[in-house]
Amino acid sequence: MIEKNYQPADIESRMSRVWEESGAFKAGRPERRDAAPFTIVIPPPNVTGSLHMGHALNNTLQDILCRFERMRGRDVLWQPGTDHAGIATQMVVERQLMERQEPSRREMGRAKFLERVWQWKAESGGTIINQLKRLGASCDWSRERFTMDEGLSRAVVKVFVELHREGLIYKDKRLVNWDPKLLTAISDLEVQQVEVKGHLWYLRYPIEGRAFSPDDPASFIVVATTRPETMLGDTAVAVHPDDERYSALVGSHVILPLVGRRIPIVADDYSDPEKGSGAVKVTPAHDFNDFEIGKRHGLPQISVLDQEGKLSLVGNEDYLRGLPEGALQFAEEFHGVERFAARKQIVARLEDFGFLEKIEPNTHMVPHGDRSGVVIEPFLTDQWYVDAKTLAQPAVAAVRAGETSFVPKNWEKTYFEWMENIQPWCISRQLWWGHQIPAWYGPDGKVFVAETEEEAVGNALGYYVEQEVITPEQGHDMAEDPAKREGFITRDEDVLDTWFSSALWPFSTLGWPDETPELQRYYPTDTLVTGFDIIFFWVARMMMMGLHFTKEVPFSTIYMHALVRDEKGAKMSKSKGNVIDPLHLVDEYGADALRFTLAAMAAQGRDIKLSTQRVDGYRSFATKLWNACRFAEMNGAALTAGFDPTSVKETLNRWIMHETTLAAREVTEAIEAYRFNDAAGAVYRFVWNVFCDWYVELTKPLLMGEDGPAKTETRAMIAWVRDEILKLLHPFMPFITEELWDVTAKRDGLLVLAPWPRKPRALTPEQIATLSLAGPTDALIPPVIGTFEDDTEEEFSDPEAEAEIGWVVDLVSAIRSVRAEMNIPPSTLTPLVLVDVSDETKARGQRWNDVAKRLARLADISFADAAPEGAVQLLVRGEVAALPLKGVIDLAAERARLEKEIAKADADIKRVDAKLSNEKFVANAPEEIVEEEKEKREAALERKAKILEALERLKKAS
């Protein structure tokens, strides 16, 4: 018995328990031993995370695919797990220690701190997993993995050691994104570009051999910079090769102000003649672009900042080399000054000596750490790197060969551009939480990389005995007693970038490096669903690692979904206060409503503009389905044993059979093509418009009539269509559909494991004989009902039934549309004249007379050779239907009203056009505001077109 009111919270809680207790989501079910596998690996959320709208979209789409393929009979593995999230987790635990006034990380030491992190993970690390379950994610939760669990850690170490042995992992001194607060290198993804209202300082660099005078432009070259504090590390001035202003100076030198360093003027394409003075200072140790210029011209790299962002000048040999004697005093004065304080002091000193030409306001993007909030420094430091260029080549070739494809396809271009210009990947982080790098150092700095400490120590001691640094006896003692080798062999303290372990996720979660049965069955995976923002950080690296270590692509399809924005199209951010919490929406509207909203709006390549009104609308859709199932139940709709939907006699029932087949095909093809919005739209239209609005409405005369066989057939057909709807809708709205499946009949299995609708066929006599002969309300619906032929069978189709019922639907719809356009009150009945129609249409008009009158608010239906005067004419399937409105409404007043509406629409269009033609508005307004104005224009044009159509009808009637 279906409850009167739809209560999502109660249903979701109950169905979650049912699924978990039944093991419905488990891969490797015995009955699917011979089924084709279908594998998706979840993009592992941070263990510190809480569900945000990006997670909700990403996991809804994955779940749609998994539930769809599971219902199609495949052995589905949706592999869940979480990422250890190095910086994020370490910060959470450090903050907790501070709040509890406990010893800091450094005070307690590495071992004890890591114990605390594992303790935190055990207590709080499951939050996001439970939230994903609330969303309805049908992962095989029994296989949950963590990027630092024992098996995955073994895979990480093996990969590092093998890549190092192959020369693909190495140590190098390069620029990295350095966080001066967290004191670690961070990835590009952890850098936020923030628009800052700053300044552009124009500095005078004296030309060597000329007497410097601020009043003599020939004695200096002007460079423009946003970072005057880094000028202390300048090693060149660059000008464009084609800039005639400076062509005579290329090859000469300038003297660096305040410092006295002699640096060359070089010609380089990076310099922009149109920007600033056209000459730029080159600081290879403090700017990524300058680093590349420095490599092209063989310039020294002089770092003038320390890890905390303070000037480091005293004792800095690179800085002091070649400077005049007086430079040491300056170095002592500025040494240890914080970078932004140093900026002010250096600018003041430059001004004092006449080296400051001018200062201009300058709004520009400045990199900030997304977790620390401080300005990030390009910092020259020794780090571990992966030779990404070598690993990228097979990954590019695989996509070009079609082994892996992107959906939408345009993302392939982005992938190729990045992969073909890929830089070395910095994989070391100055943290404690993470996979510690398996490298050990001897007393002379020689590196020993090995899978275990024992192996590294053995290799190191053997080497130093051979080099006669230690005696064989000392080597033996050190091997036996760790205390004796303390300080002689030390492990690298750094940990690996979190993305390093994530890059192995598709195969490490299945047991690699062991050849496990799971690895053989479920790898390569089928589809990766992910956001475009991690195409480089994760997707590309999984491709590289998967191909290198398994010789196979990790997935055949990569579906890139777009962003979820607010209803105006703005990116969600805490600072804007426009973040929508998916769990709040789940609490208020139910998980099914949120899931359906996200699917319905997930058009390929288009960002989602999410509004609570849309979610509320799909909550109403769920209620509509609930009430339709209650209607079916109250009218005795039930599947009887042996019912064959292809053998129904009633035209209406054959029509709904035809429409159900079309809907099933449309939904199936759309999901297969990753057109989630089209699939959701198709099932929505079928449920709301076809089933609820038309079929249910049109069955009422049959259900209330005296024709027993027709009534019995219709009840069974309603139940059959209801079940097909529950199947089609299940991937999108799993909770409500599973609940309705459970309460509408006695079943022998869950909907989540029921077969997906395909092409219905009649049951054989033998199959019918095996069915229960109990009454319709007590019948156990066996799995054979709703079983399907393979795709070679001809699809059910009934053009005659479609022509008959489709005519009724089109006629009533057209009349309702005109009544709405003309403001005809619902209480006013209008006559209908079918004009010069065929005998077939005349017969239809007579057969459906009562239904059409009731649904279209008609006084009567008549037939004539010509349309009466004052009638609005409608074209219904190529024939004319006329609505005489003379005397029903004031035609002149209605015409005036419509003309007024057109004028209003024109005014709206004119107002928007004025905005969009204003170059200042388009250039300065936020992108989402401009987009909103364009949408307003489209809506006004559409509204105007409809009013013009109505006005044209009215003119003809007049």
Question: Model-flagged regions — what are they?
Answer:
Residues 1-242, 283-296, 300-318, 343, ...:
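N-terminal, positively charged nucleic-acid-binding surface of large information/translation enzymes
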Residues 123-133, 371, 620-633, 653-663, ...:
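Core structural elements
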Residues 194, 282-285, 377, 488-494, ...:
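Conserved phosphate-binding loops in nucleotide/dinucleotide-binding enzymes
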Residues 4-6, 14-16, 66, 134, ...:
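NTP-handling and nucleic-acid-processing catalytic cores
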Residues 370-372, 564-568, 572-650, 745-751, ...:
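Catalytic adenosine-cofactor/nucleotide-binding cores of aminoacyl-tRNA synthetases and other
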Residues 4, 81-84, 113-118, 142-153, ...:
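Conserved short loop/turn motifs at secondary-structure junctions
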Residues 83, 180, 186-192, 441, ...:
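Acidic, turn-prone loop/beta-hairpin segments
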Residues 616, 745-958:
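C-terminal low-complexity, glycine/proline- and small-hydrophobic-enriched intrinsically disordered tails
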